[in-house]
Regions:
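Non-heme Fe(II)/2-oxoglutarate
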Residues: 173, 211-216, 220-334
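Extracellular structured ligand-interaction cores
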Residues: 27, 101, 136-142, 152-154, ...
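A short secondary-structure junction signal
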Residues: 115-118, 123, 151-160, 166-170, ...
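Non-heme Fe(II)-dependent double-stranded beta-helix
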Residues: 2-24, 31-132
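Short, conserved beta-strand element in jelly-roll/cupin
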Residues: 130-150, 208-211, 245-248
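Double-stranded beta-helix
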Residues: 138, 148-222
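Secondary-structure boundary elements
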Residues: 89-98, 131-135, 144-152, 164
Length: 334
């Protein structure tokens, strides 16, 4: 697993090691969040869902990321989300958290149907934190149900880029109108933007993640993913990833909680953000979505813990137990 993996006790005990990695590089790989057997069970459930599609209806989407079909509410997605909670609980030092209802990533091997491989010198680098958010706002995460080596479908980052977040958005080249259009969404970098980061010492690095591991990153980190490389050793390796983000529940405002309840009750997807600046995902695929989506929440999503994470049930912030950091994220007006 190399230098990018923190010892497996990190989930419970090594918070300092996780935070050091996040501060130094902007990301951290944590192994053994799930066991191999757990991963195989969840993969099996996703394969059962995939089997409901016809040959020409497969839900594989651009960059392997699926944010439709209510996938954020599928049983295995909620099960993985609950398993990943311990990581965020370690980071935030509280179990009073809210979760995004985020997407998943599934991709079949490109060797299977002569599909596209990675093209050198291409990228879709982006920031998931807009200029409206000042400074640090949270950590994103992705749980890997299958191993991803550097030549597989692999997460890629500009190392250290969170430290340049304010400087990047303060440039004259970034127009205020462009910032406004991305108040809650992400910013797609141009070639000139990427060159600017390179000039400031931030270079691309692929980040391998072991099966059952999780990569956590500062939301100010510039990142994308790369398609598998042609001639890779593991020609039959799929991609199965579940995206999870959790932040302290005490940060949420009334309007945020209203949107979270709507997402839960209507089985809607949300953006990456769990506590502030919630955005609901709109339907994208009309008839296909209706045919292959679930119509009611699975049992695991109706548990007390899941309802707390979804913002449907309320935490007791006066019970004497830790509520998380005593500061709140800052916002700007453009």
């Amino acid at each position: 697993m190399g230098d990018d993996a923190v010892n497996s006790t990190a989930v419970q005990f090594n918070r300092d090691a996780i935070l050091k990695e996040l501060n130094d590089k902007g990301y951290c790989v944590i192994p053994d969040v799930l066991t191999s057997d757990e991963c195989d069970v969840y993969i099996g459930k996703y394969r059962d869902w995939l089997a409901t599609f016809g040959e020409d209806e497969a839900p594989f989407q651009r960059h392997s990321i699926i944010q439709s079909y209510r996938v954020g509410h599928l049983e295995p997605t909620w099960e993985v989300r609950l398993k990943a909670k311990s990581v965020f609980q370690t980071i935030w030092q509280t179990d009073k958290l809210l979760s995004s209802v985020d997407g998943i990533a599934i991709a079949e091997p490109p060797e299977k149907k002569s599909q596209e491989f990675h093209t050198p010198n291409t990228n879709w680098f982006h920031l998931d934190q807009s200029a409206m958010r000042v400074g640090f706002h949270g950590y994103q995460g992705a749980v890997y149900l299958e191993e991803a080596s550097e030549n597989d479908y692999c997460f890629r980052v500009l190392v250290g880029s969170p430290k340049l977040y304010e400087s990047f958005y303060d440039r004259d080249e970034i127009e205020a109108e462009a910032k406004k259009s991305n108040e809650l969404g992400h910013y797609m970098l141009s070639n000139n933007d990427v060159a600017w980061y390179h000039q400031h010492g931030c270079y691309p690095r692929k980040v391998p993640v072991p099966k059952g591991g999780m990569v956590v990153w500062d939301a100010r980190l510039v990142h994308d993913n790369c398609r598998p490389e042609e001639g890779r050793p593991n020609k039959d390796r799929w991609r199965f990833v579940v995206f999870v983000c959790m932040t302290p529940a005490r940060w949420a405002r009334k309007k945020d909680l209203q949107l979270k309840r709507e997402a839960y009750e209507k089985l809607m997807m949300t953006s990456h953000w769990p506590s502030q600046g919630i955005a609901l995902k709109k339907k994208r695929l009309a008839h296909l979505e209706e045919e292959h989506r679930i119509e009611k929440l699975p049992g695991v999503a109706r548990s007390h813990e899941a309802k707390l994470l979804a913002g449907v049930e309320e935490y007791d912030f006066e019970d004497g137990r830790p509520n998380g950091p005593d500061w709140e994220p800052q916002w700007s007006e453009l």
